[in-house]
């Protein structure tokens, strides 16, 4: 059966002034999918260290199915500090475990049983994980209803035009926020100032099944091929789903 839904990419700890909290969009995605009763997996890598063991423990406690390799790199962390005005500043550590997700025989078997996968741009900052993500996408069987969801997440300088273009071509669903859309439009030279026009350009250029534009408190928009109309979704807080948190 090809009905597994996968969240693939970074698994890490956000280290805040008040303590650490588990983070990573792929794990968040897989967790919330599982809460709807679907068969999900999180695919990532952690280190052979205490932080890595803690991530595995949290996922097990949450009954989140996973395919996580332990590798000879430290478990990923994001250092969160506050400036003098209380604005958070983020430092995403480099050379960590989720930068080095290996493509194993077990991962190949998972890809062959996957109907939908969600991946981002951050986990592709390193060549090893980028190659693994692309091999996974290319290994997935070409079946009706298959979804390759690119949840773009532009962080610091951990993205490039080449990686983004390749991901646009490999995905069939794109999720992007309004700030990221402005950045992408500048990088690729998309004309006009209307955000919806830019979404239609992306939808057509990359033959997407769907494009989801999130605009924070201003709501979200869903674009699909066909007549130019889009569905407006109500705003519920920020553009990100509630995060998976460590059990207290």
Named regions from a protein language model:
Residues 4, 147, 173, 209-210:
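Proline-centered loop/turn at the N-terminus of a beta-strand
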Residues 109-110, 166-167, 204:
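Structural alpha-helical scaffold elements that stabilize or flank donor/cofactor-binding regions
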Residues 19, 52-53, 104, 129-131, ...:
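Conserved strand-to-helix beginnings and helix N-cap segments that scaffold or border functional pockets
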Residues 39-121, 138-144:
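Conserved N-terminal subdomain of the carbohydrate kinase-like
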Residues 1-3, 192-248:
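Conserved phosphate-binding/catalytic region of the ribokinase-like
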Residues 9-10, 44, 150-152, 176, ...:
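Active-site flanking residues adjacent to catalytic metal/cofactor-binding acidic residues
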């Amino acid at each position: 059966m090809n009905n597994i839904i996968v969240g693939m990419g970074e698994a890490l700890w956000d280290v805040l002034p008040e303590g650490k909290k588990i983070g990573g969009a792929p794990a968040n995605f897989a967790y919330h999918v599982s809460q709807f009763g679907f068969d999900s997996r999180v695919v990532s890598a952690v280190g052979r260290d205490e932080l890595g063991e803690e991530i595995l423990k949290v996922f097990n406690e949450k009954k989140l199915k996973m395919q996580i390799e332990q590798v000879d790199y430290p478990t990923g962390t994001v250092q969160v500090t506050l400036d003098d005005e209380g604005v958070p500043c983020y430092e995403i550590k480099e050379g960590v475990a989720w930068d080095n997700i290996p493509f194993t025989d077990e991962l190949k078997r998972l890809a062959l049983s996957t109907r939908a996968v969600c991946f981002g741009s951050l986990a592709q900052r390193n060549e090893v994980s980028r190659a693994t993500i692309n091999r996974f996408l290319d290994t997935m069987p070409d079946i009706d209803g298959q979804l390759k969801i690119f949840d773009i997440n532009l962080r610091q300088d951990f993205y490039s035009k080449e990686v983004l273009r390749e991901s646009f071509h490999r995905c069939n669903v794109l999720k992007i926020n309004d700030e990221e859309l402005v950045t992408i439009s500048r990088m690729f030279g998309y004309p006009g100032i209307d955000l919806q026009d830019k979404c239609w350009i992306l939808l057509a250029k990359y033959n997407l099944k769907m494009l989801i534009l999130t605009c924070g408190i201003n709501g979200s928009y869903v674009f699909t091929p066909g007549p130019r109309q889009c569905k407006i979704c109500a705003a519920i807080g920020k553009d990100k789903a509630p995060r998976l948190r460590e059990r207290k």
